[in-house]
Amino acid sequence: MSNEQMIDIKGPLIGEIEVPGDKSMTHRAIMLASLATGQSTIYKPLLGEDCLRTIEIFKLLGVNIELAEEKIIVDSPGYNKFKTPHQTLYTGNSGTTTRLLAGLLSGLNLNCVLSGDASIGKRPMDRVMKPLRLMGANITGIDDNFTPLIIKPASINGITYKMEVASAQVKSALLFASLFSNDSSKITELDVSRNHTETMFEQFNIPISISGKEITTQPNAIEHIKAKDFYVPGDISSAAFFIVAALITPGSDITIHNVGINPTRSGIIDIVKQMEGNIECLNITDTSEPTASIRVKYTPNLKPVLIEGDIVPKAIDELPIIALLCTQASGTSIIKDAEELKVKETNRIDTTADMLGLLGFELQPTDDGLIIHPSEFKKSATVDSLTDHRIGMMLAIASLLSDKPLNIRQFDAVNVSFPGFLPKLMLLENEG
């Protein structure tokens, strides 16, 4: 990633759009469809770089996967007929692929090596490896914490485990490993995190029960899996950039259709409402993965907000763009309990404060979040995504607060989760 992109977009933003399919659900749909015997079709998936890495890995395991227009066709021999790969399974920049497959592959009686790019090589894996070993997994890594991860055949046991971090990736790794156990498992969350793995297990016929923060899987659960067609809602993490863009750009009025509003993911909607932003959800569907059309209008005089506790895991990936939104509030906002930001593609506490600080915004990083003061785009500077897709898109939205173009280095990082992000933003500008 080396390219530099000049962003020169002016408001108002007007119109109706859809955003790409949900990244979390696309990963999980590919994994579950590959484990099941037979054909599954995944409609409206995200075909960003992260999800393509997941697809390539299952191809190496012997699954036939075809990409067609707005769908993925998975034709699998089933988990018990996977073949041992004869090369490293490359996960690229995808923490989801790396951590979830650490659990899934641990139960497959295969010799595998998982490795990613330089960013993945810096992200902690002990949070997954330690509980997987308690389940009997044979998994090792560099300094017992970093990729590449070496996974060898092992017999997986059930586990009763209290999560030490509020991480959907760790939870999901354990749930995938538990599919191959002869015993039941009970996992208790620290705080409720995104529950796509649980809802999608049910859709692929895998028995699972949930009571508050407790999740219980059944013995030999993998034997119940069935091929299934799956429709992927639009990604609320991608919609978040357009939500904030409309809120901070005078005269804007946009509608984003078919966005997933799973209550474990929709923290940004709750936060915008706390700030008294003009946002409403229309055409809500009543399913295990609900969707809505989200209409957002420019809102001056936003209220400052304290973001802490249970809402943080429900908005963890959106916190950088929410931090930008908070600079436009009428008072000081605070984000707390967000230590997980430190172990994303970058330390997003520091990169958010540093990159917005270069433009004159006033944010103070703390050990677990940010203090954000009302501030303006005061000076022009060349900024950098630092290869983090969400930082790149956040900076592009920040440019709407300036009358001058903004140059962003390594902007192609946005292709990890949102190919076509800039043309979509320009479409709203042109309609306005």
Swiss-Prot record:
Catalytic activity: 3-phosphoshikimate + phosphoenolpyruvate = 5-O-(1-carboxyvinyl)-3-phosphoshikimate + phosphate
MF annotations from Gene Ontology: 3-phosphoshikimate 1-carboxyvinyltransferase activity
Chain residues that bind 3-phosphoshikimate: 23-24, 28, 167, 169, 317, 344
Top-level class of the enzyme under EC nomenclature: transferase
InterPro entries attached to this UniProt entry: Enolpyruvate_Tfrase_dom, Enolpyruvate_Tfrase_sf, EPSP_synthase, EPSP_synthase_CS, RNA3'P_cycl/enolpyr_Trfase_a/b
GO BP, sorted A to Z: amino acid biosynthetic process; aromatic amino acid family biosynthetic process; chorismate biosynthetic process
Listed PANTHER family: AROM/DEHYDROQUINATE SYNTHASE, PENTAFUNCTIONAL AROM POLYPEPTIDE
Name under which the protein is recorded: 3-phosphoshikimate 1-carboxyvinyltransferase
